[in-house]
């Protein structure tokens, strides 16, 4: 699920351009509601009465001037623009697709507000009003309690709060002398004074790649630098009112992303993430921890995280077993690059079909790697997601066929039962 930033403009209203954010997996009917909520004073009709069109002509997005110059045809539709289907997802290929990237100065959605829309005191409008009010009450009482954590803004206090919310315990594991003797020594990365971490990202990517090149080639993997703004580690944690957002510095995954970078959000064949800090602080571990949690929920593979300054701190983290009904994230720290790269090579040499438990040269016991989605509770069909889907389904049907009184009442009852303060009266 990716947040899209869409620039919208109301047709025939000069200076009406505005920006909205919406999940790419949301339906267009949801986009209508978001647009109305963004403009409560200027858009007074029901959200379902809005008509949305792609602000695109000749396969090119319109700019502000182009959107302002759009004319309506005899049907009240912007000439040459494709109407968006309220029953389809925003990311449907007929709309924005999976690889949509907004550009500066572009307008993406044209909004047509019907003329002569007047409120009515009829039974129909009353029922729509009730459903809309109850929907907003539910969102305010239940859905608005979600907490959002941005990886790069993680602090010790936020990290401790996140771990507490997810009921996760972090357990350090002490390293042992390497089996088979000391690994081949490797020089520490040399940081250039006066340059930021970001300015040296290309250099340290080459450093990592040079020390694990053989295993990368043998397993068709690569070390990929994640550009700023590519928030590929953004996810809603199932079963918890927690959202994680952001990215990491480097990811080791299938080499196909070098040929086709647009596959990066899918994280094909991902093995591990690498968070680089020139100076490792107490909050750095929580940043790597939140990135690991996000990636674990996004992909099917068992993955590892590495927090490192590329000199004397190489901390590996992974989702381990469960103890006292709490998921364990284990961590072990090495102090030399030679040891760390030997561990990385061992990890990457494991096939994608290998057992989740593996032997690493720095640990006495096999590393147990598990998935958080097997250890954390999920939201039931009758709770948050089910309620939200019921409300959206009602609006989808009503936008096409008109209000359904029985369905509206059923949705209202379902919502009120889910709110503790109202469940007594339902």
Swiss-Prot record:
<dbReference type="GO" id="GO:0005576">
    <property type="term" value="C:extracellular region"/>
</dbReference>
<dbReference type="Pfam" id="PF20147">
    <property type="entry name" value="Crinkler"/>
</dbReference>
<feature type="region of interest" description="Effector domain">
    <location>
        <begin position="115"/>
        <end position="426"/>
    </location>
</feature>
<comment type="similarity">
    <text>Belongs to the Crinkler effector family.</text>
</comment>
<feature type="short sequence motif" description="HVLVXXP motif">
    <location>
        <begin position="108"/>
        <end position="114"/>
    </location>
</feature>
<dbReference type="GO" id="GO:0042025">
    <property type="term" value="C:host cell nucleus"/>
</dbReference>
<feature type="region of interest" description="LQLFLAK domain">
    <location>
        <begin position="20"/>
        <end position="57"/>
    </location>
</feature>
<dbReference type="InterPro" id="IPR045379">
    <property type="entry name" value="Crinkler_N"/>
</dbReference>
<protein>
    <recommendedName>
        <fullName>Crinkler effector protein 4</fullName>
    </recommendedName>
</protein>
<feature type="region of interest" description="DWL domain">
    <location>
        <begin position="59"/>
        <end position="107"/>
    </location>
</feature>
<keyword id="KW-0964">Secreted</keyword>
<keyword id="KW-1048">Host nucleus</keyword>
<comment type="function">
    <text>Secreted effector that is critical to pathogenesis by suppressing plant immune responsess. Promotes Phytophthora infection by suppressing the H(2)O(2) accumulation and callose deposition. May induce cell death by regulating expression of cell death-related genes.</text>
</comment>
<keyword id="KW-0843">Virulence</keyword>
